[in-house]
Amino acid sequence: MTNVGTVRTAFVSGASRGIGLACARALAETGVHVVLAARDAAKLEQASSEIPNSTWVTIDLSSADSIKEAFAKAGKIDILVNNAAVTKDGLALRMKKDDWDSVISTNLTGAFLATQQVLQGMMKSRWGRIINISSVVGEAGNPGQANYVASKAGLIGLTKSLAQEMASRNITVNAVAPGFIETDMTAVLSQEVKDNIIGHIPLKRFGRAEDVAAAVRFLASEDAGYITGAVLNVNGGMYM
């Protein structure tokens, strides 16, 4: 197992289910204290009860005040996983501005504001790991998801800029770009749609949340200390 360390604290947004929950579990297995964050308090409490050495806070990534409050409760953070995301799909021609703003606000601006909350502490301790969960569509594009794609592509740009700004303080900033993963978001797809997607994946299957979590666990570890500004694709070869 890739060891992160026993004195670190990780903050994982969108941690009540899916990829975020898998990331929280994977990091906890390395001995770090994990702060689970999401909107749903009941789901967070249940998830935290199943993960040793974890706590939870509610957070609304579309609200600057909520972000500040959540990180004030969480305390000093050594590892930040910006995972929370929403979708409001639609063709660009008909997309409402509110749907654009909502997705960008949560997925991109929320990640930026969360990152701002942890930078000072990381800089002071001269150690930090920031891992942004992007998406294969942030690299390849996808029709009907202009807002979501823009937010995920923006996370990659944010990752690269922050990596250059923070390198001198021994803070690494990387992105993980999942492909199609078995989550609540993909469970609603028809079998016909799933089969069509799998036909474009060289490994011929959807990924698991644990596949993404393994990449996050590695990037959070000491073993990944010389990796920064990278985008780690976890997509079964769908996009290269």
PLM feature segments, named:
Residues 135:
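Residue(s) in the substrate-gating loop at a strand-loop-helix junction
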Residues 115, 151, 159:
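Active-site helix of classical SDR
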Residues 16-17:
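Conserved glycine-rich cofactor-binding loop
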Residues 91-92, 96-104, 197:
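Substrate-binding pocket helix/loop in short-chain dehydrogenase/reductase
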Residues 6, 140, 217, 228-240:
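Short C-terminal tail/terminal secondary-structure segment
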Residues 120, 164-168, 225:
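Alpha-helical segment proximal to the catalytic Tyr-Lys
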Residues 93, 140-146, 168-169, 204, ...:
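Active-site loop immediately N-terminal to the catalytic Tyr-X3-Lys motif
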